[in-house]
Amino acid sequence: GGITQCSTRYAKANNKYMKDDYRPDLESIYLMYFDVNSLYGATMCEFLPYGEFSFVDDDAFETLDILNHPDDAEIGYILDCDLNYPPNLHQLHNDLPLAPEHRNPPHSNFKKLMLTLYSKQNYVLHYRNLKLYIKQGLELVKINRVLKFRQSPWLKKYIDLNTQKRQESSNEFEIHFYKLMVNSV
């Protein structure tokens, strides 16, 4: 399932194309709508783990320079770490907090995937996510464990082939077939 959250959605445009509702004395604001296709396929074209999985020795954690580790390096990492969500970010991140986690919402016996502003203990994530979270202001408190692996864009040719075949399709069956070939991986 997807993320469970309560958020406030508010956006108001103000530009010359709004005719009578346009307020020239205020800043011009445009709203954009994006209909993005093949998000799942696009992520599968990235560098993905494929082999030689091993845990990194505890004393080697100190030498890991995750922030400067290239996204397209031959070696990748999944980390178990503790993260602090500084209070100064709470207002800024309130509508879409980082680092989703499975928690029991108030008055519920069932865990949901939730976005919270809580600090995280033993949070498991890919090193690229950790780089993003730190760049956005979360603080890395401690690395508990690190899983190292070889990575490459090993699915890219398969995804690109099915995407091309889907674009060349001349009937609904083929269109759905090639879409399913990507989404079923």
What are these regions (language model features)?
Residues 1-185:
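Conserved acidic
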